[in-house]
Amino acid sequence: EHWVLLGSNGAGKTTISRIAAARLFPSSGAVDVLGERMGRVDIAELHPRIGLCSSALAGQVLGGESVLSVVLSASYGRIGVWHEEYDDPDIERARALLEALGAGELVGRAWATLSSGERKRVEIARALMPDPELLILDEPASGLDVAGREQLLAALTEILSAPGSPSMVLVTHHLEEIPV
């Protein structure tokens, strides 16, 4: 299933997406994500089940981090590689995701050297890396020119139409950014 959160600035779309991604706890009430009750589940176990692409998360990446490390670290629900070890299948998956999103040539580049369009592609590859059950894309086309937006939406449409693709929540201001 795929959903869209469509609304104006300040409507709470990003707040809802952060709660759904288990990155923000609600101030009241109860929230279940992927069958798990927030506050009763180990967030470290829940994060790899949720792929998140958001400018807030991207802002936490260190500038010197390589594109490959940015994508790989999502396997553990972390930002940046620390002490984790990655094997060849992990590296192959990260490279394949970057390639599918038109960012294969960026593998060795540092995060700080990327344009906003390149960063968006890497962020989405990162969100898909753990093979999530739920994919949350918070304004994935923001900052892209028309051609870049169309390329990104085409890649997303292809990825999300594949068998076994994750459920998706897309946050946007624009109807034309909703993949078919």
Segments from the language model and where they lie:
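Conserved ABC ATPase signature
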Residues: 85, 110-114, 118
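Helix-to-loop junction immediately C-terminal to a conserved catalytic motif
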Residues: 21
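Catalytic Walker B motif of ABC-type/P-loop ATPase nucleotide-binding domains
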Residues: 135-138
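Conserved ABC transporter NBD signature motif
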Residues: 29-39, 46
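Conserved ABC ATPase "signature" region
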Residues: 72, 87-106
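Hydrophobic anchor residue at the start of the ABC signature
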Residues: 124
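Conserved catalytic motifs of ABC-family nucleotide-binding domains
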Residues: 131
